[in-house]
């Protein structure tokens, strides 16, 4: 019965998960799904949770600490003490054997400690905030990288499908040409070479189409992997390449690339400077005194038998209130060396921040230049494709009118195929360069 109930509940969970799993995703939905299920993001979020626990751990060291201890002893053989026999009327120089205490004893104690002052504790509280900020920065950086990756992969899947449509269109056109040319050849109106040229083009198109179809499957699997989608489950992408790559919207001017204060790497570097500054404070605080207060309460029970659980067992109590003050006096220049080392680390962090700012500024301007170049190249390749299609159509007419040879037609067709490939690559380049620039400036519209 229990087994049947377990299987029933398991089946319900599986069905519920299947119902919640979408079978189609737009780009925004894919990004949202990836931000919720990507493994890198999940682990980055766990780092934030760890930082929060570390913060509370540090706070807890400044709060009262209470501990208890129970110590039970049973002497299998009682210790013997020697005392001068003359104390008991014996001869001088002789010793009497005495046994003190009972065979069994139990001591229970309760201790409370409270930190009064510790410079390192105060610095530690500040450090936990910085540590949490760094974890949040790394989480945001992971989010940005995953968004960029999902956008690129989603676009790659659509572009792969777009390229397949080109190849299928080319294949259909070649097959029609082959049938027509082959019929002309059989009737003696065309040379065998013309048939062979078409066969050669068809073979190349078929090979390219097979490769493109395999590449599409790989891109789909990569997208599923990144967004945390089951690999064995079919996934339909609802957006078309025209939905993502809209010229009027996609080529909107971005803000000044020199506006880099939102860059996540710079913010991480700034927090690193804060972290190293706190480490310097920590080393300096080690020269300050540490003050702790404590309160001990102890109860002792003695007996020759194990009677400690009896209600009439007698317990002897003692209490102690104290203050512990630890004052560093001389460390043989050890603290000084640690402080100087922390200063060097702080200067390194400041230099690294300056380097990061300069590098990001250069990268942002370079990315903007690449993006603008990609836009110009897109328009060039778009026009080249239009011209290549017209040229191919004209030469196809010329070929069937006997004005050009099959070799010339094949060269024109190869030119068209190259223009199609270049156009697809140009779209991909614009998308890739824009998302790279948006990531650098932290301006993604998918936020």
Predicted regions, residues:
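Bacterial Sec-dependent N-terminal signal peptides
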Residues: 1-28, 35-38, 445-447
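Small/polar, glycine/serine/threonine/aspartate-rich low-complexity segments that form flexible
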Residues: 20-22, 69-110, 240-248, 294-327
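Bacterial Sec-pathway N-terminal export signals of envelope proteins
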Residues: 18-67, 71, 77, 231, ...
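Sec/SRP-type N-terminal targeting helices
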Residues: 42-46, 59, 100, 116-143, ...
């Amino acid at each position: 019965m229990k087994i049947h109930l377990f299987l029933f509940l398991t089946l319900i969970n599986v069905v519920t998960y299947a119902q919640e799993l979408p079978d189609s995703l737009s780009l925004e939905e894919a990004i949202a799904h990836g931000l919720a299920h990507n493994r890198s993001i999940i682990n980055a979020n766990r780092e934030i949770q760890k930082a929060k626990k570390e913060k509370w751990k540090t706070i807890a060291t400044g709060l009262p600490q209470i501990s208890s201890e129970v110590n039970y002893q049973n002497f299998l053989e009682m210790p013997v003490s020697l005392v001068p026999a003359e104390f008991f009327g014996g001869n001088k120089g002789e010793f009497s054997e005495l046994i003190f205490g009972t065979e069994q004893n139990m001591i229970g104690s309760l201790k409370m400690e409270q930190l009064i002052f510790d410079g390192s504790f105060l610095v530690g509280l500040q450090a936990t905030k910085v540590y949490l900020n760094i974890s949040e920065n790394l989480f945001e950086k992971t989010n940005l990288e995953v968004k960029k990756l999902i956008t690129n992969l989603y676009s790659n899947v659509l572009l792969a499908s777009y390229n397949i449509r080109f190849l299928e269109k080319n294949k259909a056109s070649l097959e029609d040409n082959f049938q027509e040319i082959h019929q002309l050849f059989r009737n003696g109106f065309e040379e065998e070479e013309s048939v062979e040229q078409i066969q050669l083009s068809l073979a190349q198109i078929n090979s390219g189409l097979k490769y493109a179809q395999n590449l599409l499957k790989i891109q789909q699997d990569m997208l599923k992997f990144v967004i945390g989608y089951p690999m064995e489950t079919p996934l339909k992408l609802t957006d078309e390449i025209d939905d993502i790559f809209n010229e009027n919207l996609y080529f909107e001017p971005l803000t000044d690339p020199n506006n880099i204060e939102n860059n996540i790497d710079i913010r991480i570097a700034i927090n690193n400077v804060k972290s190293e500054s706190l480490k310097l404070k920590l080393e300096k605080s080690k020269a300050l005194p540490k003050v702790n207060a404590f309160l001990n309460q102890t109860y002792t029970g003695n007996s020759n038998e194990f009677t400690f659980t009896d209600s009439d067992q007698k317990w002897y109590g003692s209490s102690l209130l104290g203050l512990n003050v630890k004052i560093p006096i001389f460390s043989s220049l050890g603290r000084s060396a640690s402080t100087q080392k922390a200063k060097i680390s702080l200067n390194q962090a400041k230099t690294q921040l300056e380097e990061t700012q300069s590098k990001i500024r250069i990268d942002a301007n370079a990315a903007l230049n690449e993006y603008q170049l990609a836009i110009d190249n897109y328009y060039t390749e778009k026009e080249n494709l239009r011209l290549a299609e017209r040229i191919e159509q004209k030469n196809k007419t010329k070929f069937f009118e006997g004005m050009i040879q099959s070799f010339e037609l094949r060269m024109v067709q190869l030119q068209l195929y190259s223009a199609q490939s270049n156009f697809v690559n140009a779209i991909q380049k614009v998308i890739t360069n824009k998302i790279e620039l948006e990531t650098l400036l932290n301006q993604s519209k998918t936020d």
